[in-house]
A protein has these predicted regions:
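Ser/Thr-rich, Proline-interspersed low-complexity disordered segments
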Residues: 2-8, 421-518
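N-terminal substrate-binding region of glycoside hydrolase catalytic domains
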Residues: 3-113, 117-125, 130-139
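Active-site cleft segment of glycoside hydrolase catalytic domains centered on the general acid/base Glu
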Residues: 85-201, 207-224, 246-270, 299-306
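Aromatic/acidic polysaccharide-binding cleft in carbohydrate-active enzymes
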Residues: 245-316, 332-334
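Carbohydrate-binding surface patches
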Residues: 332-371, 376-377, 417
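C-terminal beta-strand-rich structural cap/linker in extracellular carbohydrate-active enzymes
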Residues: 384-426
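Juxtamembrane/start-of-transmembrane alpha-helix segments at the extracytoplasmic/lumenal side
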Residues: 515-532
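C-terminal membrane-anchoring or membrane-association module
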Residues: 528-551
Length: 551
């Protein structure tokens, strides 16, 4: 039998293709699952065909049984339905009215919504249209304007069947085409019928990888772009991860990034916390399990193809356990460390890590007399507060990638049974004690799903140029350097997922355990330091005076 975590999972935390190991998904408390629906598999030979075995009902039934919401992603045009390339070609008849039988895409949407209504009510329309052919990974061969038409027809046809369907923009990589979303919105907002239909989408989807601090930066930039066009849409991070290149069970001779197994685990803890603090409505890891992984490809899975679990799986369990129920989140970023505070009502979780190779000794305001300090493998100890604070030394980051410290150091959770935000922010010791260089706070509200009006005849769109008056900041991506040979690395054994109290001891990873120090006797120490300093100054002055007077 599948043993799930106590209580229903927090729906905000998801995993792509969690159905591939439903036992592990239930144990880890996965809240939502993204499943690919290939049009070319559903109807491989013609519009009258329907292959229900493409996505077996058992996947959907197990998800429902364990409280996982399923989000569908539709893509991949069959040969019979396009005049363009198979897979990425624009569907035939897309420019026809949504009710025209020759609009093959509209027909598919109505069929899909009818089959899965009540079981899948969130649909992502295609994948990564911002990757232009022939760039590796491209999936859409149409123009940006044609993608808007694809989205619009999908939304109109879906709401003909069910007004409760939520339509998502395709996940965007951002760094392939930084201005894609801005140009898309500029075009969409020129559609005369768009405003009353929310421009035919409810949610913006993002794919963010490798660099921890890119997560809040891209979310904030996306929110600013939406606001520039008068829109306030939820933002989901549908894919995020930092795949390791040093797993001895999946060696890679060349890799684009230098990332250890432990850094993959750190990345998840950091990126999920930062996504919450930036206001993301949901976050999901790509992906759950490495199925059919070709040799030399990056192993994104939290679970290997043989069902053994990487350290990142244990980190994910910490997320679903200690981030669940967050009602507000705050990021305080300092030169040497980052602190994310998650207000969970009766509980408060602080997520801490070093940003550079240097150790960071951090004082954290206490909300209670004691707290649980948990490392990223799940080992924990109880620490006592003194003088209204805790003091923790965070190990420095590995920073082995050519781009620098793309992932912070080993990540620690400080969990207190106390409600409310802390009275003050954490600081590094001895410096800086000033305000953090970045502070972001968001209140997290329950998801709302806006039902769009019933579809109406679609007006003819006239493409317009992107407005030049709106200039928004963009993040310049770092170019990927030439791959270098992967250094030999012997990772630590994957710890068990059960959190067990342990006495303070060196962690089983190359990074040291945090040094927990409690301030005591600070007044007497200060007096002694002053006296010693005065005596030393007097001695130095005496020597100088004797030399000046020739004695």
């Amino acid at each position: 039998p599948v043993v799930a975590q106590d209580g229903p999972p927090d729906i905000r935390f998801g995993a792509v293709e969690a159905f591939r190991d439903p036992v592990a998904a239930a144990e880890a408390g996965v809240g939502w699952d993204r499943i690919l629906f290939y049009w070319s598999e559903l109807q491989p030979n013609g519009p009258e065909e329907w292959n229900g075995y493409h996505v077996p009902d058992v996947w959907l039934n197990l998800a429902a049984e364990h409280g996982r919401q399923v989000v569908g992603l539709l893509k991949h045009t069959p040969a019979w339905a396009t005049d363009g390339p198979v897979g990425c070609g624009v569907p035939r008849g897309l420019d026809l009215p949504v009710d025209d039988p020759a609009n093959l895409w509209a027909n598919l949407i109505r069929r899909v919504i009818g089959v899965y209504a009540g079981r899948i009510d969130h649909w992502i329309i295609w994948n990564e249209p911002d990757i232009a052919p022939p760039t590796y990974g491209y999936e859409w061969c149409g123009s940006m304007e044609e993608y808007y038409r694809l989205l619009k027809v999908a939304c109109m046809a879906a709401h003909q069947v069910s007004p409760d369907i939520t339509i998502h923009l395709a996940g965007m990589t951002t760094w392939h085409d930084e201005t894609y979303l801005r140009r898309f919105l500029a075009f969409a907002t020129q559609d005369p019928s768009g405003s009353e239909h929310g421009y035919y989408f409810d949610v913006v989807s993002l794919h963010i990888y490798f660099r921890t601090e890119s997560v809040p930066e891209i979310i904030n930039e996306t929110q600013a772009t939406l606001a520039a066009y008068g829109l306030n849409k939820p933002v989901w991070v549908n894919e995020t991860n930092a795949p390791p290149n040093s797993d001895p069970q999946w060696p890679m001779e060349e890799a684009n990034y230098e990332i250890s197994l432990e850094e993959q685990a750190s990345f998840l803890l950091q990126s999920f916390a930062l996504a919450l603090s930036a206001g993301a409505e949901r976050v999901a890891v790509y992906k759950w399990l490495d199925n059919d992984l070709p040799p030399g490809f990056e192993p994104f899975g939290l679970i290997r193809a043989d069902y053994s679990r990487r350290p990142a799986y244990d980190a994910y369990r910490l997320i679903t356990t200690h981030y669940a129920g967050t009602v507000s989140a705050r990021e305080d970023r300092y030169p040497l460390h980052t602190l994310v505070t998650l207000d969970r009502g009766a509980l408060t979780t602080r997520v801490l890590w070093a940003r550079t190779q240097a150790e960071a000794t951090v004082t954290v305001p206490a909300l209670a007399s004691q707290a649980r300090l948990i490392d990223q493998a799940g080992a924990e100890q109880t620490i006592e507060s003194a003088g209204g604070q805790y003091m923790v030394t965070l190990p420095g980051a590995r920073c082995a990638d050519a781009r620098g410290c793309i992932i912070g150091g080993p990540t620690y959770l400080l969990v207190e049974e106390a409600a409310g935000a802390p009275p003050a922010t954490a600081t590094s010791v001895p410096a800086p004690r000033e305000t953090p260089i970045v502070t972001t706070t968001v209140a997290i509200t329950a998801e709302t799903s806006v039902a769009l009006p019933t579809a109406s005849p679609i007006p003819t769109e006239t493409p317009t140029e992107t407005p030049t008056a709106i200039v928004l900041p963009t993040e310049t991506p770092t170019a990927t350097p030439t791959s270098t040979p992967t250094p030999t690395a012997t990772p630590s054994p994957t710890p068990t997922a059960t959190v067990t109290p342990v006495p303070p001891s060196p962690a089983p990873t190359p990074a040291p355990s945090p040094v927990v120090s409690l301030p005591a006797g600070l007044g007497m120490q200060s007096v002694l330091i002053v006296l010693v300093s005065l005596v030393a100054s007097a001695v130095v002055f005496g020597v100088w005076f004797r030399r000046v007077n020739g004695r």
